[in-house]
Amino acid sequence: MEEFQFIKYKGFDHVFKYSGPWLWWLVGFYLCLPILAYTLLPYLTMNGTISGKRKTVSIFVLGDLGHSPRMCYHAKSFSKLDYYVNLCGYLEEQPPFDIIDDINIDIYPITVTKNTSNLPFILFAAKKMVVQFFQLLKLLSDFRGTDYVLIQNPPSIPILLIVLAYIKVFSRKTKLIIDWHNLNYTILNLKFQNLKHPLVRILKTYERVLGQFADYNITVTRQMKEFLIKEFNFNKKKIITLHDRPGEQFKPLESLGVTKQEILESHDIFRDIQNISKYKILVSSTSFTPDEDFNLLLSALNQYDNSLAERGLPPILIIITGKGPLKSQFLQKVKQLNFSDNVIIKNAWLSSEDYPLILSVADLSISLHTSSSGIDLPMKIVDFFGCGIPVITLRFPAIGELVTHGTNGLITKSDKDSSVNESQEIYRLLTEAFKNDELLDKIKQGALKESNLRWEENWNNKMGKRFEYSTD
């Protein structure tokens, strides 16, 4: 064993003794790598980043741009402040012409992922998230250096996490704006009806934790602002309440320069109805999803049909615009009820140009929105008011921020947690409005007054000073 005596363990002391200070520099550099990568990586590949004196906002909508009016209104408002606007979303329907023609707005399509292979829900959801991840990553990379990224919530998965992570790592000067239309976890709860369900609680935590990293949070109601402060512990200084207001395309009939009769005679939806001038016209808009129970309306209309002759009520035409997963079920129920010619129900998918025109000739509108959270408001009522049309609406916590009973509309006494029959309430308010001309005229005047409150003025008052800038 004597020949192996020269092999002795000496530890690492000799390494430090003979290596010199360069080793310490190497160790220090190694330990600093995460920090260096986080701070310098965004600047190592600057090709393609947005730069210049004019500011840029990138708006992401995981929905159809043609039917996302609030986000399109944001785009127009930023454009008027001389921002470059990158507007990203689905292009299932053509966006409004004023968006297409705006020289400051560029539209970038996001491909709709459809379940053409009839995959189970979980597998399809996973596939959709992966596809959206790469699409969003590509767009974010193209817009790296944008001054602001504006997203809507819901949906929050996967877009909130992807956008936030990208900004924090690759585009750290970019500020994140979240426009809270509703709470995503409450929509998921429509499926489970249990706020303590693990998936619902996970999604609530996801929204609460990630939402706090936003630089600005915009809410559609004051109640939603209070919720974010009290329940999600958001900084109230970062929250702006921006109520929906109608765009310029929604105008009362008196402002259109055309008569009601001319519209009734020219549009296909009215042409096959005998004596259309005798009918009261109702309108409603829906996406045919579970949060709007159209069985309530059908039941009320059935009661109206059965009592029309006895109570001297006028015949009605109700136009329901929109499409969605429960549309075929709704149309089948209409067929089964076999309404008389005194109650005509039509479903139409209208263009963004035709929709305001049809609203303008209505006598009354109906909203069945109850809100999964109770603290959002339906854009459809804002559109109705823009055309000067009063509304019958179901009661829920935030509805008073938009509709005042007996002034610009009528609100049911019941809500979804009440023992009062909601369909009976809708029927009662319908007959009350059409039997009492004085009441109908009063709420009509109130709706016309609401039509004077416009998006542009409201946006400039609440948002303009925060986002205006000078190119000098």
UniProtKB/Swiss-Prot annotation:
Subcellular location: Endoplasmic reticulum membrane
Gene3D superfamilies on file: Glycogen Phosphorylase B
UniProt GO BP: dolichol-linked oligosaccharide biosynthetic process
E.C. number: 2.4.1.142
Record topology, Cytoplasmic segments: 42-118, 140-472
Membrane-spanning ranges: 21-41
Source superkingdom: Eukaryota
Intramembrane segments: 119-139
Keywords: Endoplasmic reticulum, Glycosyltransferase, Membrane, Transferase, Transmembrane, Transmembrane helix
SUPFAM superfamilies (alphabetical): UDP-Glycosyltransferase/glycogen phosphorylase
Recorded catalytic activity of this chain's protein: an N,N'-diacetylchitobiosyl-diphospho-di-trans,poly-cis-dolichol + GDP-alpha-D-mannose = a beta-D-Man-(1->4)-beta-D-GlcNAc-(1->4)-alpha-D-GlcNAc-diphospho-di-trans,poly-cis-dolichol + GDP + H(+)
Ranges of the Lumenal topological domain: 1-20
Lipid bilayer topology: Single-pass membrane protein
MF GO annotations: chitobiosyldiphosphodolichol beta-mannosyltransferase activity
Keyword Transferase listed: yes
GO cellular component: cytoplasmic side of endoplasmic reticulum membrane
Pathway: Protein modification; protein glycosylation
Keyword Transferase belongs to the record: yes
InterPro entries (alphabetical): ALG1-like, Glyco_trans_1
Family the entry assigns: Belongs to the glycosyltransferase group 1 family.
Functional note: Participates in the formation of the lipid-linked precursor oligosaccharide for N-glycosylation. Involved in assembling the dolichol-pyrophosphate-GlcNAc(2)-Man(5) intermediate on the cytoplasmic surface of the ER.
The protein's name in its UniProt record: Chitobiosyldiphosphodolichol beta-mannosyltransferase
Organism: Debaryomyces hansenii (strain ATCC 36239 / CBS 767 / BCRC 21394 / JCM 1990 / NBRC 0083 / IGC 2968) (Yeast)
